[in-house]
Amino acid sequence: MKKILITGGAGFIGSHVVRRFVNKYSEYQIINLDALTYAGNLENIKDIENKSNYTFIKGDIVDETFINELFSQHNFDGVLHLAAESHVDRSIEDPLAFVKTNVIGTMNLLNAARKQWKDNSEGKRFYHISTDEVYGSLGAEGLFTEATPYDPNSPYSASKASSDHFVRAYGETYGLPYVLTNCSNNYGSYHFPEKLIPLFINNIINNKPLPVYGDGNYTRDWLFVEDHAIAIDLVFHEGKNHETYNIGGFNEWKNIDLVKLLCQIMDQKLGREQGTSESLITYVKDRPGHDLRYAIDASKINRELGWKPSVTFKEGLEKTINWYLNNEEWLQSVTSGSYKDYYQKQYS
């Protein structure tokens, strides 16, 4: 039985990946390692907690001693590394926390995997999941490709760029078998409401202001999280060693247009008069170092592995909104306590 370590598996993207692997690969033993910080929640994976091929371990990848002990207790055939601090606003407020988790934490995992696989790396794989933000900001035209030079502009993207470089360096220097992917903005269920779509869904439900940075004309490419999980599965099993794949949704939206679409759908779902939610839009001071546009060229993964998004944005957004409306208890539980303090500080 193969033993696979998935880090950050109680988070947003990680929980979808863990669920897919546990349900699809009964011959794998899945170890889910998560520190259960504010964005990690065991409720996200409650439906699989009693599966015989699943084990949860609470721990922090920043703790080198803990990681070394974990690898001494388990012989892993693969590592899917999703654990990360990922919110740009929080990185501006506390960049060192992002360095610790995203850089030092990744280093600890790389070192442990290198030592464990030193004498036999056949069939092993370290899969590092990263972001399109490492490429910086696009102009009005063009797409990020796997050959686009790195040009990070926020502490978050700088920390992820650093971790990407270390993964590749370990591949070149030590022969560590790795694959790496850079993805566009994800959306879907179990997404902590600090990112645009879940934040605004939650605010509309509660008749709170919808804070839009600057003029709202920043453009992002949106990818349904379940499509991303399928791509991760495919890259882990069929991707070529030492290769990078971009994963995108082929789905660009200006922030303000997306917000207005959300408002229209939510008014309809909640039985409110059209325009009610849109009246909540509030333009706020722009974020420092705000990248104008991200857009992914995902032709490589399509060409080499046959992946493309299967869920349209309309379908995905409908599923996402319905999930949040049907899981208000989950929303209330994750938006209590420290979340309220952070929100007040960030958007007041």
Q: Predicted segment positions?
A:
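A glycine/serine/threonine-rich, flexible loop-to-helix segment
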Residues: 48, 142, 193-201, 262
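Short secondary-structure boundary micro-motifs
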Residues: 81-82, 186, 194-195, 277-279, ...
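C-terminal substrate-binding subdomain of Rossmann-fold SDR/epimerase-dehydratase oxidoreductases
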Residues: 4, 17, 30, 37, ...
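Residue-level detector of secondary-structure boundary/capping sites
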Residues: 157-158, 191, 253, 292
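Residue-level signature of the cytosolic catalytic core of signaling kinases
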Residues: 41, 140, 189-193, 251, ...
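Proline-centered turn/helix-capping motifs that create local helix->coil transitions or kinks
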Residues: 118-119, 127, 136-140, 175, ...
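N-terminal Rossmann-like NAD(P)+-binding domain of SDR-like oxidoreductases, especially those catalyzing
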Residues: 1-186, 226, 236, 255, ...
